[in-house]
């Protein structure tokens, strides 16, 4: 890992940031899910408290953040939580193709699938994704009386929501299940409500996430990941994505990492070098997301606490 000589000097000055660092700035893109918000503020906290730089946070979906990073003008400089292969189309275009975005080589491992509460799983003997197609199970998940059980497949703008919409079709569940897109807070409230009422509810779930600390839930079994049965075309690649996709197996494990505008190395080189060394674990992200979602703490609060509690790890990221 490269040594940051200038950072060593800066680290010895507790009350003031050097003017050279004050000149460096970064705009951090903040996706909607709690883990991404937590990571965004960890990045920002380290930039401000340890590097002495200036930080701005801009909310946005995946497409907007990648397009802004591609422009390289500082409108948005970094995406805090890139899931691959979910967002592979953006990486193919902007990282591999145009080279305008740089992808971190320090990912943590993510997992995703479809879940129900443990109580509902036990009560209705629901352990496999195909169990959602049993009429009595679908009826127990139908809260609005339209004849179909509800399944939250993700938030608007999420690539994973598109994957799950195709999954519902290709697992033969469309006659029984209604795919729903809504913000994640709606999903969390619905899970809590369904457990309290003893109702069924299926939902997209992933690790790391606060959900595993908040509720007793189980991920449903799916056929093992098979590339031949997992051909996903995203809308930004083809408007006929739904008809050209086929997803009938479990998602592969995910590599999750940050990505930043390649031009940041010229505009804010110290920050860019820190980004290249930045590294978290799935456990880090789950715990911070839990503090936000279950305990009502702000991303700023959990990020500051994490940075203070992990000073040695931060030192390593800064080359100290």
What are these regions (language model features)?
Residues 23-35, 53-58, 148-152, 275:
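Short, well-ordered beta-strand elements
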Residues 33-34, 54-70, 179-190:
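Short helix-initiation/N-cap motifs at beta->coil->alpha
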Residues 35-53, 166-168:
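Short, polar/charged alpha-helical segment
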Residues 62-118:
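N-terminal segment of the mature folded domain
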Residues 68, 76-81, 152-231:
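Ligand-binding pocket segment of bilobal, Venus flytrap-like solute-binding proteins
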Residues 99-152:
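A conserved helix-loop-strand patch within extracytoplasmic ligand-binding domains
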Residues 112-122, 255-267, 291:
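A bilobed periplasmic-binding-protein/Venus flytrap-type ligand-binding module shared by bacterial periplasmic
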Residues 213-274, 278:
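C-terminal lobe and pocket-closing loops
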């Amino acid at each position: 890992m490269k040594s940051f000589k200038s950072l060593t000097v800066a680290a010895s000055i507790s009350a003031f940031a050097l003017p050279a660092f004050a000149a460096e700035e970064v705009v951090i893109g903040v996706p909607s899910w709690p883990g991404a918000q937590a990571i965004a503020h960890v990045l920002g906290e380290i930039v401000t408290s340890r590097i002495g730089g200036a930080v701005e946070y801009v909310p946005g979906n995946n497409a907007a953040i990648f397009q802004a990073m591609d422009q390289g003008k500082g409108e948005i400089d970094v995406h805090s939580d890139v899931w691959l292969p979910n967002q592979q189309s953006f990486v193919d275009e902007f990282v591999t193709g145009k080279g305008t975005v740089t992808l971190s080589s320090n990912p943590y491992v993510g997992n995703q699938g479809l879940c129900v509460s443990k109580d509902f799983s036990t009560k209705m003997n629901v352990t496999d994704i195909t169990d959602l197609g049993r009429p009595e199970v679908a009826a127990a998940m139908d809260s609005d009386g339209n004849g179909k059980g509800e399944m939250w497949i993700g938030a608007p703008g999420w690539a994973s929501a598109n994957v799950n919409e195709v999954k519902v079709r290709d697992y033969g569940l469309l006659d029984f299940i209604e795919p729903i897109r809504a913000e994640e807070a709606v999903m969390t409230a619905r899970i809590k409500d369904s457990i309290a009422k003893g109702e069924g509810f299926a939902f997209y779930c992933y690790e790391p996430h606060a959900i595993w600390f908040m509720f007793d839930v189980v991920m449903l079994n799916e056929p093992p990941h098979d590339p031949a049965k997992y051909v996903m075309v995203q809308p930004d690649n083809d408007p006929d994505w739904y008809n050209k996709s086929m997803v009938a197996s479990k998602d592969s494990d995910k590599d999750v990492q940050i990505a930043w505008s390649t031009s940041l190395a010229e505009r804010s080189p110290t920050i860019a070098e820190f980004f290249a060394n930045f590294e978290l674990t799935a456990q880090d992200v789950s715990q911070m997301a839990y503090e936000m979602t279950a305990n009502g703490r702000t991303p700023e609060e959990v990020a500051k606490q994490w940075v203070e509690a992990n000073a040695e790890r931060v030192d390593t990221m800064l080359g100290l």
